């Protein structure tokens, strides 16, 4: 993945291979919390890898197209339009593909120790316990997928139509809202 540009609010990365190209636009919303807008028109790309020994989980949302991940033991996970997947650094992602060579979605990454340290009071104010969310969805054992429409889908869908002049503030509010909805 090559860095195309970076400014005070975001970094834009490009990926190219023989099957097409894609971009990922990354915003650091809070310490340890990032939002990445993914736009891919290719058949496959390298899988995302968390650094070893990290305590991180991710929330993936598919807006359009389809994405598949090959995980351990030859099993596959897929997301289609409206689907959400939660996974953790414990998930082994071996291969990522786009069966229809088209994928638009969002990935939210949360480094639990970094987020708790930087946002402890704010998380407490909203009764958000990141480790409890991990336990609720058993993310250390396996990914969790929500197919179709759900309350979290509604919250994430609002992230696709944000005016640039309020993007960072809006993302901050919506990430907190999303984490509150995951508690239910």
Where are these regions (language model features)?
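N-terminal functional module of multi-domain proteins
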Residues: 2-104
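Alpha-helical bundle regulatory/interaction domains
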Residues: 70-184
């Amino acid at each position: 993945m090559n860095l195309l540009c970076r400014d005070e609010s975001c970094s834009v990365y490009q990926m190219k291979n023989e099957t097409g190209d894609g971009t990922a636009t990354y915003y650091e919303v809070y310490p340890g919390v990032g939002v990445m807008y993914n736009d891919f028109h290719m058949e496959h790309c390298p899988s995302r890898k968390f650094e070893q020994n990290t305590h991180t989980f991710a929330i993936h949302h598919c807006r359009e197209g389809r994405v598949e991940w090959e995980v351990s033991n030859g099993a596959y996970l897929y997301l289609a339009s409206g689907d959400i997947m939660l996974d953790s650094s414990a998930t082994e992602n071996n291969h990522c593909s786009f069966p229809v060579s088209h994928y638009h979605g969002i990935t939210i990454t949360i480094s639990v120790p970094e987020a708790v340290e930087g946002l402890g009071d704010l998380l407490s104010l909203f009764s958000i316990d990141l480790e409890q969310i991990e336990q609720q969805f058993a993310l250390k054992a396996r990914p969790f997928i929500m197919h179709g429409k759900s309350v979290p889908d509604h919250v994430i869908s609002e992230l696709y139509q944000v005016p640039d002049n309020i993007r960072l503030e809006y993302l901050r509010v919506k990430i907190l809202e999303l984490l509150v909805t995951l508690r239910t």
